[in-house]
Regions:
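A broadly tuned preference for mixed-charge, low-complexity surface segments
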Residues: 25-41, 45, 72-95, 99-109, ...
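Residue-level signal for functionally critical sites in structured catalytic/ligand-binding pockets
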Residues: 29-32, 36-42, 110-114, 121, ...
Length: 186
């Protein structure tokens, strides 16, 4: 690698065995500039696809958000019924299809498992430090509002449509609470 600010031998940096660089990116986040073909030839790419199994993703979000909450001084994790709502919502919005098989408008935002962990963590911190209580549906809606709509304001409309057309029909208590908390979307 040439470093134009340095003169002589100091201006050239050569690779050595053992040197590694690891970078991550979401496949849907292309950024401003595409990588050049020359740069792509010098790199190895590994694609990690979304977790196909609900239970595996659920357990991962539960474990990782629990660790983060503990580190944040929150003595309890997110209740399983709220985690089920969160993970199901992320999966359905990510795939563009409900668990019942109904097609949804696709989101422009990447809704990764890491983002679900972040929402669970922020919901846990919010609920504990604002109310001293366990996470409820309002906390999940607040977290989703930021995560699902951060890149495109149109995604807020898609989230509202999901709540009105899909969540409204579900009869489990956690889903009813999630639907009733929809007015917390900004």
């Amino acid at each position: 690698m040439a470093i134009p600010e340095l003169a002589g031998e100091e201006g050239m940096l050569f690779a050595r065995p053992g040197f590694n660089l690891i970078a991550t990116a979401n496949t849907r986040d292309r950024g401003v500039n595409e990588m050049s073909a020359a740069l792509k030839r010098r790199l190895n790419f590994e694609s990690v696809f979304p977790i196909p199994d609900f239970e595996t993703e659920f357990q991962l979000v539960k474990r990782e958000s629990g660790k983060l909450l503990k580190e944040s001084g929150v003595p309890q994790g997110v209740p399983e019924d709220m985690l089920e709502v969160l993970v199901t919502t992320f999966r359905e919005l990510r795939t563009g299809q409900t668990r019942e098989g109904v097609a949804l408008s696709p989101f422009s935002t990447v809704l990764s498992t890491a983002e679900a962990v972040s929402v669970a963590h922020s919901a846990g911190v919010r609920s504990w430090f604002l109310r001293g209580e366990a996470v409820n549906a309002e906390d999940i809606v607040h977290g989703l509002d930021g995560a699902a709509t951060k890149d495109d304001p149109e995604d807020r409309k898609r989230l509202r449509a999901y709540l009105e057309q899909t969540v409204k029909k579900r009869r489990e208590a956690s889903w009813t609470a999630f639907y009733e908390a929809r007015h917390h979307l900004s």
